[in-house]
């Protein structure tokens, strides 16, 4: 098995774990309506809850950049004060259409750790457009299996200084944003390198480069491209 094929499988497993947390499960089938009863309106016809009805505003400010995952999908924002706002990647198109860098936003949701929040809704304070966290529509179709999605990833290499450390819900480091905006993700238990803002950092792996920047799932990391060390002791 080639290094590239083995790496694709490893990345597929790592990304599948993140996708399983990010995309909500499909809704259960509705029970049949009893004879003579008035059926409820379809879910699509029900408006989302009003902003602030279920959760408070947990962050607000100007959008510094849109964050993307290794597939190139928008899965959050970074505000000018450094706050990282997480949002499900299946809403990438809706979020990137409603929110642009420089826009002022209000974020409704829940705080997580180290300056990050999980958004239930993001409001463009200027236009009033609001993007809600909601399941994919019933006609969206089933997503591709992780190993097929991973085939679309391409080798990427980045090098620079750490601008911000990304963390999971329990505060574990699972990625970095470099000063040029490149995003590197990695399993928290795999990193053998201390990462702090301002530190030199380099990585190679599989990911995407598009108009919003570069994002990759790391296979190896180091303080420079000439000093990379593998994250995995062996490939699957």
Predicted regions and their residues:
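Bacterial N-terminal signal peptides that target proteins for export
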Residues: 1-8
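Short boundary/loop segments of OB/S1/cold-shock single-stranded nucleic-acid-binding domains
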Residues: 25-56, 133-155
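The feature marks the first
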Residues: 41-91, 106-111
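Structural detector for short beta-strands of small beta-barrel domains
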Residues: 52-71, 148-170
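OB-fold (S1/OB) nucleic-acid-binding surfaces
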Residues: 70-87, 167-186
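Short nucleic-acid-contacting surface segments enriched for D/E, G, S/T with interspersed K/R
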Residues: 91-108, 189-204
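OB-fold/S1-family single-stranded nucleic acid-binding modules
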Residues: 114-141, 210-236
């Amino acid at each position: 098995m080639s290094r590239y094929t083995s790496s694709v499988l490893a990345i597929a497993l790592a990304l599948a774990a993140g996708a399983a947390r990010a995309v909500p499960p499909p809704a259960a089938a509705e029970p049949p309506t009893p004879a003579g009863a008035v059926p409820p309106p379809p879910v699509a016809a029900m408006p989302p809850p009003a902003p602030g009805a279920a959760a408070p505003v947990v962050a607000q400010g100007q959008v510094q950049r849109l964050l993307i995952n290794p597939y190139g999908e928008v899965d959050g924002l970074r505000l000018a004060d450094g706050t990282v706002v997480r949002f499900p990647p299946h809403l990438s198109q809706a979020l990137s259409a409603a929110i642009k860098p420089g826009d002022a936003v209000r974020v409704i949701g829940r705080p997580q750790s180290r300056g990050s929040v999980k958004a239930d809704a993001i409001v463009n304070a200027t236009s009033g457009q609001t993007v809600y966290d909601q399941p994919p529509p019933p006609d969206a179709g089933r997503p591709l299996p992780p190993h097929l999605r991973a085939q679309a990833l391409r080798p990427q290499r980045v090098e620079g200084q750490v601008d911000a450390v990304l963390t999971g819900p329990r505060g574990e480091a699972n990625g970095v944003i470099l000063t040029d905006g490149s995003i590197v993700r990695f399993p928290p238990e795999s990193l053998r390198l201390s990462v702090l803002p301002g530190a030199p950092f380099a990585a190679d792996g599989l990911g995407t480069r598009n108009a919003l920047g570069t994002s990759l799932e790391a296979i190896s990391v180091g303080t420079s491209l000439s000093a990379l060390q593998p994250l995995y002791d062996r490939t699957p």
